[in-house]
Amino acid sequence: MRCGSLCRFLWLWSCLSYIEAVPIQRVQDDTKTLIKTIITRINDISPPQGVCSRPRVAGLDFIPRVQSVRTLSGMDQILATYQQILTSLQSRSVVQIANDLANLRALLRLLASAKSCPVPRARGSDTIKGLGNVLRASVHSAEVVALSRLKAALQDMLRQLDRNPGC
């Protein structure tokens, strides 16, 4: 009886010994590739006719300005805000980008856990309050501003990932 248990344990051990963890470098490379894909998608979306990429529309302060984020949790927070904004836009052209942001956030969490960082938790953004009123007034301008600022933030994140960001 004990020999049977020992044999099952050894068989299970041999199976588990072949399972390898995903190398952290591969996750980081996948993260960079997804960022580049999102930037390409943003470039493929042309702004609507007559909308400047830097409009002077009041009320778009809820869209984060470009700032260098040096931590994985900071990157996750920025992406959570943009994901919420893009989802609120209800535009067919940004649905895939919003989904890509969710996948990118999952990859950043995986990077954070591989570095033994606490899991980044996106806080509820108070800056998104009243988003519906602004979007009703200037949905196209909000989309253009959000995408241009998201693109700049993603380019900064790409640079930061090369520098091995902290928690």
From Swiss-Prot:
Signal sequence region: 1-21
This protein's record includes keyword Signal: yes
Pfam families found in the cross-reference section: Leptin
GO biological process, one term: intestinal absorption
Matching Gene3D superfamilies: 1.20.1250.10
Subcellular localization: Secreted
UniProt entry keywords in alphabetical sequence: Disulfide bond, Obesity, Secreted, Signal
Disulfide pattern: C117-C167
Protein name: Leptin
Lineage per the UniProt record: Eukaryota, Metazoa, Chordata, Craniata, Vertebrata
